[in-house]
């Protein structure tokens, strides 16, 4: 009973998990609970912040019940989270004044467009590393303050608090004593100056957001506070790690060297490159962000966000009903006999990096009378790889770094067909992590370092294993022919929607 463990709270877009890791980085227990998605209007996505909180408590309890591990055996807690999702709550009662507005939600697009029309794109990009988009927290805060009666005045009086999910959960777990976020989450708000490492007063003034709303910003591996005993089954345990989900996955992949790149195939795909101690401002619509900070040292990152990745396979299963499970897509792709002439562009919610075209919609090209169900499934699966190449090509252009290896994780990373096609299309090695729990593991590592559970990153590197390595097998001519077809399909998709808009 004297063994110690680290707990990672992994709060995602559709479910939350509490995972307990041992000293070797092995998962020894897990609790998971889904929560409801709210869609008040087309394009809007919201969560109930209290449902998320209750789901966290439930998963913590389930992880202890299933394993027999006691709360007092937890040496530290790390929190990783869906980024950008925005909550504002009453400082005294702890009650949210509106639902959490989720990162996917487009309900604040008009606020973002107004900033673009007024000419603030360059200023905000230079200060925050981000493009102006409804994706980020800033416009979501402004929307809530505009649409909840009295919210602006209460915010100015210091009666309200803002937080992304990490901040909300830390505030709740500590019994309302700690209002804090970390550099990785702060850098996704569109309010944080990544050069000064402070909330940017000019942007706050531009959006009329009171600074009193905002949390203190700290590193990713330090003790932020202790759990209130009544929220952690009688134990006060340090919360000692915090990171947005994609930065946590970067750390979980131990992508600690400059130029190392990982891709998480989740609901979307998130390709992140460690750029070291200096930010690289993209000239090609990638996002400059903070990767992680340990012992006062900042590591920056370059990111390309693809909105639809694994969710394209969910679309095949739930909406099209042509597969029964996502893993079935691998068998179908292998049984397809066509020559890759079908292209699916899954722009269901627009196109992310490097296009950032919110008006684009999904399209299919290259159908013939002989096209089969398996061909269609294969083309959908291949779209994940094509979108990833779009981002990696752009990263190489922005940084001048030739990327030799892509490290991958996430649910779709179990698909061998996808990873072989990805390697072929990139003409690069693709390495699947031995432990695919890289998001939770990353924040567990950060939490463990802060409390001495692990000594340093050298000790962590000894725990990292590659599950399988894929090498390119496709000829250069075939590779470039296929990719040229994809680029044509994307261009046609964008033209189609924009021509419709012009004719309205």
Curated annotation (Swiss-Prot):
Modification after translation (UniProt): The phosphoenolpyruvate-dependent sugar phosphotransferase system (PTS), including enzyme I, and histidine-containing protein (HPr) are required for the phosphorylation, which leads to the activation of the enzyme.
Entry GO terms, CC: cytosol
Chain sites annotated for binding sn-glycerol 3-phosphate: 13, 83-84, 135, 245
Gene3D superfamilies named among the record's database cross-references: 3.30.420.40
Biological-process GO terms, alphabetical: glycerol catabolic process; glycerol metabolic process; glycerol-3-phosphate metabolic process
Matching InterPro entries: ATPase_NBD, Carb_kinase_FGGY, Carb_kinase_FGGY_CS, FGGY_C, FGGY_N, Glycerol_kin
Domain of life: Bacteria
Any one GO molecular-function label of the UniProt entry: ATP binding
Residues annotated for ATP binding in this entry: 13-15, 267, 310, 314, 411
Keyword check for Zinc-finger: no
Catalytic activity field: glycerol + ATP = sn-glycerol 3-phosphate + ADP + H(+)
Activity control note: Activated by phosphorylation and inhibited by fructose 1,6-bisphosphate (FBP).
Enzyme category, top tier: transferase
Binding-site residues, ADP: 13, 17, 267, 310, 411, 415
Residue(s) carrying Phosphohistidine: 231
Recorded family membership: Belongs to the FGGY kinase family.
Subunit structure: Homotetramer and homodimer (in equilibrium).
Record protein name field: Glycerol kinase
The organism of origin for this protein: Ligilactobacillus salivarius (strain UCC118) (Lactobacillus salivarius)
Origin organism lineage: Bacteria, Bacillati, Bacillota, Bacilli, Lactobacillales
